[in-house]
Amino acid sequence: MKQYLITGGTGMVGSQLVNEIKKSDSHITILTRHDQISNDKKISYVNWAKSGWEHKVPQNIDVVINLAGATLNKRWTPEYKQTLMLSRIQSTQALYELFKSRNKAPKVLFNASATGYYPPDLFMSYTEVYKTLPFDFLSDIVYQWERFAQQFEQLGTRVVIGRFGIILSNEGGALQTMKLPYEYYIGGKLGSGQQWYSWIHINDLIQAILFLINNESASGPFNLTAPIPERQNLFGYTLARAMHKPHETWAPSLAMRLILGQMSTVVLDTQKVLPNKIQALGFQFKYSNLKIALEDLISK
């Protein structure tokens, strides 16, 4: 039986990942910030906001999956920016300290990250060979998160970092926010509309995470995005068609930056990111085409 330890296991990605892992011979310990009782013999909850939580984590953990982090979908006040950073760094450091104090480190750590690692560009195509230093707040979060995760290599753990693109899911996240203006018939171009949206269907993301965990030759950063990113204007048009709504309005960049503040970078300052590394290992995406991905989700 394989033992998993998961942070963020009750979130959008984590909950679907847990449901998939349960299909195998496994036991899952989920770290949460509140007391929770499990009705499933394959799942245990540990409240790591309480003192002594470390002693409740099983000794023989094989796989650590670190997804914990405050949502980006809130206004980035100075106080919340600190929460965004610390929620990721402190949880990762706490995991590292836990296993550093034990004689048995996990075989593999899968640590979430984001395509915000790469600088925004209308023409550049980014693969995993591109390396950079932080250039804005979001990239600094990503850079520091990855750096703290890489400490696990000192313990002999194989470290896999998944740079998530825009996750398309019916259970929350970006797609629900994107759909909202179209439901009120005010969807359309954002800014220039030329910025890239590197997206991934939630089902492909779950399978990609498990593929990387189970592939012993996988290590380092992986771009977890569909092979065919789209520019925002075409993305919005495709979404509108799937929803049978118009795609006619325009929100200027200046207005969006004034309304959203720094959070507007998530929508306007984006990157064209390609999943070369995971494809080279043989992973096949079920949803490479945006039209098919959106129709699958919106039809449900």
From Swiss-Prot:
<dbReference type="InterPro" id="IPR010099">
    <property type="entry name" value="SDR39U1"/>
</dbReference>
<dbReference type="InterPro" id="IPR001509">
    <property type="entry name" value="Epimerase_deHydtase"/>
</dbReference>
<dbReference type="Pfam" id="PF08338">
    <property type="entry name" value="DUF1731"/>
</dbReference>
<protein>
    <recommendedName>
        <fullName>Epimerase family protein SAB0724c</fullName>
    </recommendedName>
</protein>
<dbReference type="InterPro" id="IPR036291">
    <property type="entry name" value="NAD(P)-bd_dom_sf"/>
</dbReference>
<dbReference type="Pfam" id="PF01370">
    <property type="entry name" value="Epimerase"/>
</dbReference>
<dbReference type="InterPro" id="IPR013549">
    <property type="entry name" value="DUF1731"/>
</dbReference>
<comment type="similarity">
    <text>Belongs to the NAD(P)-dependent epimerase/dehydratase family. SDR39U1 subfamily.</text>
</comment>
